[in-house]
């Protein structure tokens, strides 16, 4: 399935039904009073969060959503039927923003949480509504009102509690594949991962914790370079960031600084999040080098540095224990 995390759509609520002009014409009431009914309300457009969805793909080609119009009134003071509301299902974590003003209209983070965006137009009045002592046979009616029209941007921000970040080829996908049931594409070259991968990791108490492998972070990501800018938003909701560094990289310290700088430039509180610094692929370096580079990283980051081998599943228990302590 294609991963789409942004979509601009137009939401059009239904028009209210018109009122009608009608008079009672019964067998023994040849000159009855006004009986024209009111029109029904137009349908509204409602967004609803759904746990079963993980992408905004449905809105890639369907950019205009139109709710049903209300029906016109009927004789004998019968009101027209209201238009059916249109309910659009979106993934949990979808933020809705008014494109014209930039104002955030809502943030749907829980299953079945809903938000009415475009409200249907009110139905018009039939002539029975205008009956008065001064006018016993009104012939006035009103048309239904137009429904609201909104142009909105949908932006999906994943609801993972733990975000795995790092330069391409640091081993993020391998890590999420060995600690969860996720099965991302893995290969020994940069940019294998082109979309965020999600995996549920079971804690000791049996409860699940959602991890996300965030792809494409390189120098300049916060400014739109590479793939990273599109995906940095997905770590805004995380509680903890696991910063994975390739132990066999040419300069692991420089790699660490690149990601830290991108978090700082992007802003939005990313640099304030709890971060666990992890050296990966330790099976490919000797012990002396590992001790030296770990110490330098600790001095640079002012944080404890964990060492793991995702491929050999070494050090993973210590890493997960550290994660559970901080959630």
UniProtKB/Swiss-Prot annotation:
Matching PROSITE patterns: G_OBG (PS51710), OBG (PS51883)
Gene3D superfamilies in the cross-refs: GTP1/OBG domain (2.70.210.12), P-loop containing nucleotide triphosphate hydrolases (3.40.50.300)
Subunit description: Monomer.
Compartment list: Cytoplasm
EC number: 3.6.5.-
The Obg domain, residue ranges: 1-159
Protein name: GTPase Obg
Organism listed in the record: Prochlorococcus marinus (strain AS9601)
Presence of keyword Cytoplasm: yes
The encoding gene: obg
Thylakoid in keyword set: no
Pfam families: GTP1_OBG, MMR_HSR1
UniProt KW keywords: ATP-binding, Cytoplasm, GTP-binding, Hydrolase, Magnesium, Metal-binding, Nucleotide-binding
């Amino acid at each position: 399935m294609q991963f789409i995390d942004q979509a601009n759509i137009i939401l059009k609520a239904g028009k209210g039904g018109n009122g009608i002009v009608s008079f009672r014409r019964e067998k023994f009431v040849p000159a009855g009073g006004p009986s024209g009914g009111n029109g029904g309300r137009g349908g509204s457009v409602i967004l609803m969060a759904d746990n079963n969805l993980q992408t905004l793909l449905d809105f890639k080609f369907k950019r205009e959503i139109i709710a049903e119009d209300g029906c016109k009134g009927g004789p004998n003071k019968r009101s027209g039927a209201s238009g059916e509301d249109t309910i659009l299902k979106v993934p949990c974590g979808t933020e809705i923003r008014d494109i014209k003003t930039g104002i955030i209209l809502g943030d749907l983070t829980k299953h079945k949480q809903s938000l009415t965006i475009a409200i249907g137009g009110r139905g018009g009045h039939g002539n029975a509504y205008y009956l008065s002592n001064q006018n016993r046979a009104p012939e006035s009616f009103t048309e239904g009102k137009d429904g609201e029209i909104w142009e909105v941007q949908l932006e999906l921000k994943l609801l993972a509690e733990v975000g795995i970040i790092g330069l391409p080829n640091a081993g993020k996908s391998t890590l999420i594949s060995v600690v969860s049931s996720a099965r991302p594409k893995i290969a020994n070259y940069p940019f294998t991962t082109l979309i965020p991968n999600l995996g549920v990791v079971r804690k000791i108490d049996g409860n699940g914790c959602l991890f996300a492998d965030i792809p494409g972070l390189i120098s300049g990501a916060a400014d739109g370079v590479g793939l990273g800018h599109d995906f940095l938003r997905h770590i805004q909701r995380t509680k903890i960031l696991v910063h994975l560094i390739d132990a066999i990289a040419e300069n692991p310290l420089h790699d660490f600084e690149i990601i830290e700088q991108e978090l700082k430039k992007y802003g939005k509180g990313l640099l304030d999040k709890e971060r666990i610094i992890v050296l990966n692929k330790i099976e490919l370096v000797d012990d002396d080098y590992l001790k030296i580079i770990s110490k330098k990283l600790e001095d640079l980051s002012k944080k404890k540095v964990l060492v793991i081998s995702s491929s050999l599943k070494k050090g993973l228990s210590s890493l997960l224990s550290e994660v559970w302590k901080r959630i």
